[in-house]
């Protein structure tokens, strides 16, 4: 089977989310083949989960002072500070044989692909068991504070956070693989505000690719290894193809939604 691949490019927060939604909607509508996409963020941004309240979970004033965009995702989960990372999205229609018809099963398959990709980089990763969380600390709004079942750990520390949305027609899963991590910046924009205790706990629980290997790796090499991980675990051929004209038109229209304050503040 053949899958489509969109290689790493950096966009602003609103265009990133518009592209993912356009791919998802066109995949469901036209029963298109699955898509894997890698991307980055320019400028830095905070994405919030579909059900989160930015007023109570973000330091909005600090985001403004630092020039950090705020965008609401279609997927659930917690807030993520996007800076130096590779974000992935996987979109597939209902009945795609590579995935079970449930959220946790799909999470595990995608995590297995990412773990294999990391292994090609010499990084030994494993999946988090159910119920694991930071001891004696609640950083609830922050995605990387609490590894969920089937999320990816390196030496017990979370290196990737993911969230998923499903409809009757298919699913969209988004996730962030950290290249480097700055807990001071992350906690300056995501509540609770940084204290020495919060910073220490978060620093001890989060890993980043270029901090767990001997020397930094180029983003292109990382993406190639992750792509190979998907191809090998799923047993599919992955071919690089651009957005379709229909996806581009839809993306351009959806950008307006993601920029709209009403979308950012809805619950």
Regions found by a protein language model. Name each.
Residues 1-57, 61, 65, 69-73, ...:
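Active-site loop/lid in soluble adenylation, ligation, and acyl-transfer enzymes
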Residues 39-40, 80-81, 153, 178:
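Well-ordered beta-strand positions
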């Amino acid at each position: 089977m053949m899958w489509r691949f969109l290689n790493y490019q950096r966009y602003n927060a609103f265009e990133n989310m518009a592209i993912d939604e356009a791919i998802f909607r066109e995949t469901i509508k036209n029963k298109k083949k699955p898509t894997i996409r890698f991307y980055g963020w320019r400028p830095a941004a905070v994405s919030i989960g579909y059900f989160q309240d930015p007023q109570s979970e973000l330091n909005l004033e600090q985001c403004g002072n630092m020039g950090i965009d705020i965008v609401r995702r279609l997927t659930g989960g917690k807030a993520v500070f996007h800076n130096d990372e590779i974000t992935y999205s996987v979109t597939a229609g209902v009945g795609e044989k590579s995935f079970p018809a449930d959220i946790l099963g799909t999470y595990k398959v995608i995590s297995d692909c990412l773990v294999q990709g990391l292994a090609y980089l010499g990084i030994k990763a494993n999946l988090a068991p159910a119920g694991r969380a930071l001891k004696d600390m609640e950083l609830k709004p922050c995605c990387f504070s609490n590894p969920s079942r089937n999320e990816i750990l390196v030496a017990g520390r979370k290196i990737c956070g993911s969230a998923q949305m499903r409809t009757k027609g298919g699913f969209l899963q988004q996730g962030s693989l950290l290249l480097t991590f700055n807990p001071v910046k992350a906690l300056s924009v995501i509540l609770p505000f940084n204290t020495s205790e919060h910073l220490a706990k978060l620093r001890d629980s989060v890993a980043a690719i270029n901090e767990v290997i001997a020397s930094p790796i180029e983003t292109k090499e990382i993406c190639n290894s992750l792509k190979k991980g998907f191809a090998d675990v799923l047993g599919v051929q992955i071919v690089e193809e651009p957005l379709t004209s229909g996806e581009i038109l839809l993306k351009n229209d959806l950008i307006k939604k993601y920029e709209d304050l009403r979308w950012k503040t809805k619950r």
